[in-house]
Regions:
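Rieske [2Fe-2S] iron-sulfur-binding domain
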Residues: 1-113, 163, 183
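C-terminal catalytic domain of Rieske-type non-heme iron oxygenases
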Residues: 16, 93-275
Length: 275
């Protein structure tokens, strides 16, 4: 489901990715159950077959003299595969935006980690929670108990009301949260919001949090994609700008720390504990 529409996505036998209406134009059977064969998706009910553009290719239950497949077409959306993610555009054809070229989409595949997870809330609620920094003094307090870097151990506890500064940009905004530390030092954390649904974290260096376990510098972020008014799919990405790619152990750690590992999710990407 995407923006309230029930769609089916598939990669045909030629490697092309299609995204189209889930239901067959004939009797509205779900194409999620369809057979992916010879350049198209065939409905299991009466065998109507569609290509990645939604064009009907075959109507085996229709007599040759009444075959009208040329007049049948499902609603379909254009797709592009960039950075290991399938992107689509669902708006007016005359306003198609350029393809995304964030740095994480341009690095080799083994330098990035991707995951996704379904959140049962509106996408804007999820986005607001992600870019909110003030909650960390309470919600994430326990995460700093074992920190080893001097000066950072108690900053959540000692400065629970950070000073927030917002900087408007042409892509959205950046805001910083500044917390006072002992000995007249400050801890400054910045988030980037890139319209319409991206959050960028600051670079993670190898002294605290998950980066310490990776031993590599990383940048990470989230995309909050609306499924409908009550559900969103959160895409999590991390990439390293180190000389060496992410190892198998790095990817396992990121799977546990960011989003959820695959064994913690149901088939529709819900967390198991939320079933």
């Amino acid at each position: 489901k995407l923006l309230g529409e029930k769609l089916v996505a598939f990669r045909d036998t030629e490697g092309r990715v299609g995204l189209m209406d889930e239901f067959c134009a004939h009797r509205r059977a779900s194409l999620f159950l369809g057979r992916n064969e010879e350049g198209g998706l065939r409905c299991v009910y009466h065998g109507w077959k569609y290509d990645t553009k939604g064009i009907c290719l075959d109507m085996p239950n229709e007599p040759a003299e009444t075959n009208f497949k040329h007049a049948v077409r499902l609603k379909a959306y254009p797709t592009a595969e960039v950075g290991g993610v399938i992107w689509t555009y669902m708006g007016p054809a005359e306003k198609v935006p350029p393809l995304p070229k964030f740095e994480w989409t341009q690095v080799p595949q083994n330098y990035r980690h991707l995951s996704k997870m379904r959140q049962e809330c509106n996408w804007l609620q999820a986005l607001e929670g992600a870019i909110d920094n003030a909650h960390a003094g309470f919600l994430h307090r326990a995460l700093t108990d074992k920190t080893t870097r001097a000066g950072l151990r108690g900053y959540w506890e000692n400065s629970q009301a950070p000073r927030l500064d917002v900087h408007i940009t042409d892509y959205g905004f950046m805001y910083t949260a500044t917390r006072a530390l002992p000995e007249r030092e400050n801890y400054v954390r910045a988030y980037q919001y890139v319209m319409p649904f991206h959050q960028f974290f600051p670079s993670q260096i190898a002294h605290s949090g998950s980066a310490a376990k990776l031993k590599k510098p990383t940048v990470r972020g989230h995309m909050f994609v609306p499924m409908d008014d009550e559900n969103s799919m959160v895409y999590n990405w991390t990439y390293t700008f180190a000389d060496q790619p992410l190892s198998e152990a790095d990817n396992e750690q990121l799977g546990r720390h960011i989003g959820s590992a695959s064994d913690e999710l149901t088939a529709d990407f819900r967390k198991l504990r939320n079933r």
